[in-house]
């Protein structure tokens, strides 16, 4: 975005630490801090446990650069530690930038469309009249061959299904022929009272 500018803070390092003991054990944390205190006495640490990162703030950029040169990709407690210069974000304005007006008129149409805008005509639907004619000639139970088979292609045949009314009538006749099921009542279990009064 045009209003954001990333600059590097050369007096701060970000340490990517794979060992999570640094965030929980004070002895491990003291060992870690002693590595960097040799380069600068006025150093501060910020621990970000969920990101597995530590921000190390030096008093001057030279000691930060020296620490990065000496300690980058070194092992700490058996795992590799990587160091990077911290990035600071400078926002040019405290307000959000408005969106680019490329297709803004589609979201909220203005009183008149943009210059050069033309309405797109809808394409006419593709209707296969041969297929409609062939289907109209068919009756129930008949079949119609749309395309004859060749040596390389199969034939296309349409089979017309029987109407739903005939199926419904057959189902109704079967229901009438079946005897009505007799419902047998379930006997109530014997009741014996626990407390007699």
UniProtKB/Swiss-Prot annotation:
SUPFAM superfamilies, sorted = RNA-binding domain, RBD
Residue ranges under compositional bias (Acidic residues)? 163-173
Q: Which GO terms describe its biological process?
A: calcineurin-NFAT signaling cascade; calcium-mediated signaling; locomotion involved in locomotory behavior; negative regulation of calcineurin-NFAT signaling cascade; response to ischemia; response to oxidative stress; short-term memory; skeletal muscle fiber development
Identify the InterPro entries for this entry: Calcipressin (IPR006931), Nucleotide-bd_a/b_plait_sf (IPR012677), RBD_domain_sf (IPR035979), RCAN1_RRM (IPR034906)
Q: Which residues carry this modification: Phosphoserine?
A: 108, 112, 163
Task: Cite the Pfam families for this sequence.
Answer: Calcipressin (PF04847)
**Subunit note:** Interacts with RAF1, PPP3R1 and PPP3CA.
The protein in question is named Calcipressin-1
Q: What is the source species?
A: Bos taurus (Bovine)
Gene label: RCAN1
């Amino acid at each position: 975005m045009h209003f954001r500018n990333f600059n590097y803070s050369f007096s701060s390092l970000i340490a990517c630490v794979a060992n999570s003991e640094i965030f929980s054990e004070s002895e491990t944390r003291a060992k870690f801090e002693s590595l960097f205190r040799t380069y600068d006495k006025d150093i501060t640490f910020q621990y970000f446990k969920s990101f597995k990162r530590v921000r190390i703030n030096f008093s001057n950029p030279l000691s930060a650069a020296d620490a990065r040169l000496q300690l980058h990709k070194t092992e700490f407690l058996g795992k590799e530690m990587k160091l990077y210069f911290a990035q600071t974000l400078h926002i040019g304005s405290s307000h959000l930038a408005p969106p680019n007006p490329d297709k803004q008129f589609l979201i909220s149409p203005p009183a008149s469309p943009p210059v050069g805008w033309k309405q797109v005509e809808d394409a006419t639907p593709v209707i296969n009249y041969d297929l409609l004619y062939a289907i109209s000639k068919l009756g129930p139970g008949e079949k119609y061959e749309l395309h004859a088979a060749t040596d390389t292609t199969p034939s296309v045949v349409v089979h017309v299904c029987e109407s739903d009314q005939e199926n419904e009538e057959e189902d109704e006749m079967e229901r009438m022929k079946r005897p009505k099921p007799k419902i047998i009542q379930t006997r109530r279990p014997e009741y014996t009272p626990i407390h007699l009064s």
